[in-house]
């Protein structure tokens, strides 16, 4: 919400891209999801940022909450050069008992209202998103199918949490502490950090277990994990 008023300062500080979480373009729905009537401020930030740097808009579709949101959100990419990405709900924390909406269903809802979305011919980035283009659109739509499109074999991610820990995988509770080293003034700090990073890479699991929820060991919510 504060991006618009701070954008110039962030650009001067070196910001070269931004991700914005937005689960709906409907004002009442936005207020129900976030508890705040601030959709217009968020949209103002999207429009302003889209003219100055690469923007990714991230949406999580929840069954019974915002199932009608994908097409209006995708439509933002018609006139704005943004990537609108749909991320499957990962069943961790409070979401463990929620039903994930498959991205195949999300794509179907978009194509039903807007038209065929062709695979983007451009090179894939280093992340898990798969992009498509809608005819006449300035931007793209993307899909991160964390549950139904398992991409663990090519995952190159570690997550630095809000409490200074490295998580190899969001599905499991395993984490490697970094905070005490970061706050330490020892001369060998850099080497110790490197060792912890390598440890996190070594314990990275071969695959998540979102299809067998009893095996999920991460009980914290995404808002607490951060990163």
Where on the chain are the PLM-derived regions?
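Radical SAM/AdoMet-radical enzyme domain recognition
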Residues: 1-87
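Auxiliary Fe-S-binding modules of radical SAM enzymes
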Residues: 71, 78-79, 89-227
